[in-house]
């Protein structure tokens, strides 16, 4: 029989080779796993199943293969009218790492009170039953499909079972209760396994499907949509990781861009102390920004929009060519061509955006040939934040890094003399236009679906990370 450690090691190696750097990683910590598995157990009425455990039949089945023990059981059972679990509670689950790779241990403590009715006494004899169910969550590969998480090896061990009489009664009744507990000790683990483990399996499968639905739900963009799909699951420490691929769709639901595994380093995906995190690779962030802010041409009648800057530009041009400055009319016009959409750079200190534009100055709106054309490389501060469950991005603080004179009909000049004026033009025209396209934000339902009302975005080298906000 193959050692499970070897299988896990080979599987883990396969996953690492196949998906070194996924476009996005959803990291679910033990807090989220416990919360959602507990809810799934409640949905399947796990405590009601415990209250229906067939204690008497379980003791009989356990002793049936041993004639002497079977005779003893029958003798004891003659003094019992009925016996059942009167109350049951599932205590706080524990999720912890396994000694094997790609495996988690889930411990489910149970606290039950059982009662039996005997003609030896008018009151019900009650005793406490405490035990624990243990199951393993593993990454397993199917012959017919990709790897998935599976729950296996669900069992209840006699070593975790504790039985005690709640109230001491007469010597005869106490002796009967002691004999019953002695018979339950070997029988109860199998009873729990037979009746509760299938429910735990169903609850886990439901939880897993809920996580996948949550992960793959389309995220609306304006225009189009972003969709994630599962590349591979993984287990690291006490956390479940979903390595995700992504695709961008246009307004007609046609795929415009695919993102799968990449040889480019993604980010640090080692689980941290956050209950969950969604980490998105920088190139996917940039593709989303490109969808929201396509390349375009802006036409601005400068004196109508920002008259102060129009006068400042006229004074700057006068220093270069006074005759040309006098030709600037009331309909003085600018054209700004966004040669590229803003390119986001994510680093530990924050996010910046770089963009190349071509700016042309026309004396009036009827002229077809500009005074001059400038190639401008600008950078902005990029701020990511959450507002009303939406991812928001805002650009501010324009800085011009480089200016190149491309065409000039007035005379050759050093474009650096226009830097201050050009900075104001971009600040008052291009940035508001692009921020306006970002104003609707991107809906993020994941935090709320995982049970967290508030979330926050943080920036690290090459990645954007969503985590619950500190309360």
From Swiss-Prot:
UniProt keyword Glycoprotein present: yes
Leader sequence segment: 1-18
Q: Which SUPFAM superfamilies match?
A: Bactericidal permeability-increasing protein, BPI
Q: Detail the disulphide connectivity of this chain as listed in its UniProt entry.
A: 154-197
- Asked if the record carries the keyword Transcription, the reply is no
Name the source's superkingdom: Eukaryota
Question: What molecular functions are annotated in GO for this chain?
Answer: lipid binding
List of glycosylated residues:
150, 157, 260, 397
Entry keywords, A to Z = Disulfide bond, Glycoprotein, Immunity, Innate immunity, Secreted, Signal
Cellular localization per UniProt: Secreted
| Function statement | May play a role in innate immunity in mouth, nose and lungs. Binds bacterial lipopolysaccharide (LPS) and modulates the cellular responses to LPS.
- Report the protein name in the record: BPI fold-containing family B member 1
Instruction: Give the organism the record lists.
Output: Rattus norvegicus (Rat)
* Gene expressing this chain: Bpifb1
